[in-house]
Amino acid sequence: MQTKSPLNKAEVWSQTNCPACQGAKRLLTSFGIEYDECMIGAGTYTKKDLIEKVPNARSVPQIFLDGQYVGGLPELKMRLAINDNYKTTTLG
């Protein structure tokens, strides 16, 4: 049996060498949630870009689920724990 989350897509703002960012991406993957990564400092995105999107952001990761702002890794864990009650099971 394969489980699939009712959440469809995530956006993860991250930086290299960030253990919490790696943890967030692993958690999303374990829930079957695809994500786009916005890597700060890798040439495409800057800290300014993140602040424009999340004015109070002072750390990474910053995470959006289905276009709604969630917060960092602790908030993601809480959100997925709540949504885990609604996971559906696909019969194989």
Predicted regions and their residues:
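Non-catalytic, surface beta->alpha helical segment in thiol-disulfide oxidoreductase systems
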Residues: 65-92
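Conserved residues at beta->alpha junctions
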Residues: 15, 41, 67
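Thioredoxin-like thiol-disulfide oxidoreductase module
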Residues: 39-57, 82-84, 88
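Structural micro-motif
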Residues: 54-64, 73-74
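Local sequence-structure signature of Cys/Sec-based thiol-disulfide redox active-site neighborhoods
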Residues: 1-36
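Short alpha-helical
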Residues: 19, 45, 71
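Acidic-residue sensor for enzyme active/binding pockets
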Residues: 11, 37, 62, 75
